[in-house]
Amino acid sequence: MRILLSDKKQSLLFIFIVWAMALGMLLLPESAQGLYGFTPLLAVCLMMFLIVRDGYRAEGWRRLGFKFRGGKEYALALVIPVISLGAGYAVYWTGWASSLVPPDSWIKTAIYLIVYIVLGSLSALGEEIGWRGWLLPRFQWMGRVSSSITMGLIWAIWHYPAILGPRAYHSSGNRWLVLTLFTLSVVFAGIIINELRLTSGSIWPAVLLHGANNAVDSVLRNITSSSSPMLEYVAGESGWVPVILYGAVAIWMLNRNLKIKRQSISLGQ
């Protein structure tokens, strides 16, 4: 029997479930923490097959956005994290007591980056099916701009148990400062990912940007030699440089969509 719930009720129930799962991960041993990134996917399975039960109908799967659509969104999904994170590490290499460790071969490093992007995208799929595949389309009752901003904050809060708990994700430096910078970074990056998903109508640009973000950060961190906590403050997922750049792109995207909406309203009058 299919349970009929509005998109608003479905989305709020999903958020409760996925946050509860994230908190529940604190009770599991370190060896099980790899499941953390799959809690959004597990929440989707609960919603689609046990609660709403739309997983037994084609329409439930269509809303996930598995079809390859869009064009420029894929290029943006690669370029934006490369520039934003690359700029952060470049500032850190030149401005603080650290050292860039040149790899034996930059060509091999580029190949590693491509491989990491592919693997990172596959790893991010568990999250993106939940956030951008399932939740975002059902979150549009808030409006496009409000939903993108709120979704970014929801996504950031989902990471908090991993940062504040014993797992000590992003553990260098002052934890509360790192948490603040990380929240801003995830909110802004989330807005960008949401916009690429909504503009393209496909989950895959979101998956690609998420995977590229993680891959670029991993590769650049591996060629950075430093034990200073300033690395967390300047570069990477909690760095102020990526926060500014991701923020600028996110604000530009939101303003652009607001202008398009106003133009469509004025043309319809």
What are these regions (language model features)?
Residues 211-269:
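C-terminal membrane module of polytopic membrane proteins
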Residues 173-235:
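Functionally important transmembrane alpha-helices
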Residues 1-16, 237-238:
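N-terminal membrane topogenic signal
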Residues 19, 38, 78, 82, ...:
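Residue-level signature of the transmembrane alpha-helical core
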Residues 126-157, 198-202:
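Membrane-interface helix/loop boundary segments of multi-pass membrane proteins
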Residues 24-36:
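Short, hydrophobic transmembrane alpha-helix segments
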Residues 2, 34-77, 82, 89-105, ...:
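Membrane-helix interface linkers and caps
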Residues 163-176:
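Membrane-interface interhelical connector segments
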